[in-house]
């Protein structure tokens, strides 16, 4: 089965060609935990730094601001067809009858007629107003097959170009593939040298599903930009640790969506083309020990005494 592949033209940003044939820019601007200046960051990323890929989600609470930034960029002369916009449906809307209305709200907030990629944010359904952590009865049964069929209908109706999944396990991915008429084009997962997520990564490669890496620098508790191994490679290559971590993801064959609200960092994060991490240094980065996920999903889905998920291991099907 054909897999997504990277391409680059002179002076152009790297892209990955998805199974659908659509081109996905390899570096996108992440907007998780973005602030009130999100519109400015999006416009700056596109018009000044050269980004053509913006990743957001309904649950981030910034889609309206992202929409303002996209509109400003297009008013500045950027064609919509040259942009790749990703969003995600939240867990409270993971019922077949809620899929289309959820997307329509996203399109309205983003001020767009279509989006390029629409993800299932997490493969779990939550009751409206669910607490963190969830109380008894707030994690509901998820009709994965029914929801995916409605996602497929969005593609058929031209509202979405590609559909994908986030935070899936191999078990859940295999279940979805058994019924999907349009397989997921992309699987978005936490990935960095401190959490390589090899099992789902290899499963996606087997099925020709492209992988996007989120949290490429780790977390505030374990910021890999301060890891001595990363710093040593960065100093050797005369790059920043952040650039090295982003490049590591690209050389691994994944797209990547670093987030920053600082103009200087936004520009720095996309200056990762035209150079390579040498093989010996790449192997050194790969040797960083896997420690823990940034996002376990525990506070969202785990009730230790009631409900289907009593631990983070349950959330991840005890796969890692």
UniProtKB/Swiss-Prot annotation:
Q: Where does NADP(+) bind?
A: 215-269
**Record keywords, A-Z:** NADP, Oxidoreductase, Stress response
Q: Which residues bind substrate?
A: 121
Q: Which reaction does it catalyse?
A: an alditol + NAD(+) = an aldose + NADH + H(+); an alditol + NADP(+) = an aldose + NADPH + H(+)
TM annotation in the entry: none
PROSITE patterns (UniProt xref): ALDOKETO_REDUCTASE_1 (PS00798), ALDOKETO_REDUCTASE_2 (PS00062), ALDOKETO_REDUCTASE_3 (PS00063)
Q: Which Pfam family name is an example for this entry?
A: Aldo_ket_red
Induction / repression: By abscisic acid (ABA) and gibberellic acid (GA).
Where in the chain is the site Lowers pKa of active site Tyr?
88
Question: Broadest EC class?
Answer: oxidoreductase
Top-rank taxon of the source lineage equals: Eukaryota
InterPro entries xref list: AKR (IPR020471), AKR4C (IPR044498), Aldo/ket_reductase_CS (IPR018170), NADP_OxRdtase_dom (IPR023210), NADP_OxRdtase_dom_sf (IPR036812)
Active-site residues, as the UniProt record annotates them? 60
Q: Which terms in the Gene Ontology molecular function aspect does this entry carry? A: aldose reductase (NADPH) activity
EC number annotated for this UniProt entry: 1.1.1.21
PANTHER family, sorted: ALDO/KETO REDUCTASE (PTHR11732)
The UniProt similarity line reads:
Belongs to the aldo/keto reductase family.
Q: What is this protein called?
A: Aldose reductase
Q: Tell me which species this is from.
A: Hordeum vulgare
Lineage runs: Eukaryota, Viridiplantae, Streptophyta, Embryophyta, Tracheophyta
């Amino acid at each position: 089965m054909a897999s997504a592949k990277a391409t680059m033209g002179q002076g152009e940003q790297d892209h990955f060609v998805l199974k659908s044939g659509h081109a996905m820019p390899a570096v996108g601007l992440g907007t998780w935990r973005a602030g009130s200046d999100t519109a400015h960051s999006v416009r700056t990323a596109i018009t000044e730094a050269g980004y053509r890929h913006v990743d957001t989600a309904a649950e981030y609470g910034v889609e309206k601001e992202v929409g303002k930034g996209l509109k400003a960029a297009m008013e500045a002369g950027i064609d919509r067809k040259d942009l790749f916009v990703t969003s995600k449906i939240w867990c409270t809307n993971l019922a077949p009858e809620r899929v289309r209305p959820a997307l329509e709200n996203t399109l309205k907030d983003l001020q767009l007629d279509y989006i390029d990629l629409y993800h299932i944010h997490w493969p779990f359904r939550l009751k409206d107003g669910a607490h963190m952590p969830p109380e008894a009865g707030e994690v509901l049964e998820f009709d994965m097959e029914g929801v995916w069929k409605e996602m497929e209908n969005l593609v058929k109706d031209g509202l979405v170009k590609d559909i994908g999944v986030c935070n899936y396990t191999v078990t859940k991915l295999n279940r979805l593939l058994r019924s999907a008429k349009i397989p997921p084009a992309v699987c978005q997962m936490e990935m960095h040298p401190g959490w390589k997520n090899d099992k789902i990564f290899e499963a996606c490669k087997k099925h020709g599903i492209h992988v996007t890496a989120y949290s490429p620098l780790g977390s505030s508790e374990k910021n890999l930009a301060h890891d001595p191994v990363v710093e040593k490679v960065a100093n050797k290559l005369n790059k920043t640790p952040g650039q090295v971590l982003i490049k590591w993801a690209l050389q691994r064959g994944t797209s990547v969506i670093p987030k920053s609200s600082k103009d200087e960092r936004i520009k720095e994060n996309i200056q990762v083309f035209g150079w390579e991490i040498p093989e010996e240094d790449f192997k050194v980065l790969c040797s960083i020990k896997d420690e823990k996920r940034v996002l376990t999903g525990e506070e969202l889905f785990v009730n230790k005494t009631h409900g289907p998920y009593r631990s983070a291991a349950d959330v991840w099907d005890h796969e890692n």
